[in-house]
């Protein structure tokens, strides 16, 4: 029985849409513009401890589309998942939270963003595939450099915040 309790556990408890918004602050006038819109997309990953061995991982996408420096539309969506992660070898929980969990949540986010933008009457914006391992490694490197420059005593990884 004790052997079962020490086996590694990784389970998806739930994937859900946590937040979504779409704004068209300059409609309807801007819809008459003939200029090609400029699209800016940003992504953020966050992980929080919900309970012992239970984590919420969210991926947020912000799509800002402008025509001649005026916002055509702004879409922001946050897709989240609740994961049970227990008994992983030392040092493995952070990479799972920063790489595997966002990779599970992200396809749902991509579909939501494309759907919301299409329902608003625009051609869909398809978010590109993301290499969450490269993103995680870049965050870790940036955090290490920042800690080297300014020792703030936090320690650990920036990916997890406690609720």
Swiss-Prot record:
Please list the GO biological process terms of this entry.
Answer: protein folding; protein tetramerization; protein transport
Q: Which HAMAP family match?
A: SecB
MF (Gene Ontology):
unfolded protein binding
What Pfam family does this protein match (any one)?
Answer: SecB
SUPFAM superfamilies xrefs? SecB-like
An annotated GO cellular component of this protein is: cytoplasm
The UniProt function text for this chain reads:
One of the proteins required for the normal export of preproteins out of the cell cytoplasm. It is a molecular chaperone that binds to a subset of precursor proteins, maintaining them in a translocation-competent state. It also specifically binds to its receptor SecA.
- UniProt-recorded name of the protein: Protein-export protein SecB
């Amino acid at each position: 029985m004790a052997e079962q309790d020490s086996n590694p556990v990784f389970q998806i408890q739930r994937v859900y849409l946590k937040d979504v918004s779409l704004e068209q602050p300059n409609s309807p006038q801007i819809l008459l513009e003939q200029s090609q819109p400029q699209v800016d997309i940003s992504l953020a990953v966050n992980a929080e401890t919900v309970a012992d061995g239970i984590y919420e991982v969210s991926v947020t996408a912000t799509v800002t589309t402008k025509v001649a420096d005026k916002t055509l539309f702004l879409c922001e969506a946050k897709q989240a998942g609740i994961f049970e992660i227990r008994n992983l070898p030392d040092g493995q929980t952070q990479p799972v939270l920063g790489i595997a969990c966002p990779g599970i949540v992200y396809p749902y986010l991509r579909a939501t963003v494309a759907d919301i933008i299409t329902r608003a009457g625009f051609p869909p914006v398809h978010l590109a595939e993301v290499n969450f391992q490269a993103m995680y490694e870049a965050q870790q490197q940036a955090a290490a450099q920042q800690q080297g420059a300014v020792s703030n005593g936090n320690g650990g990884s920036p990916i997890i915040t406690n609720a």
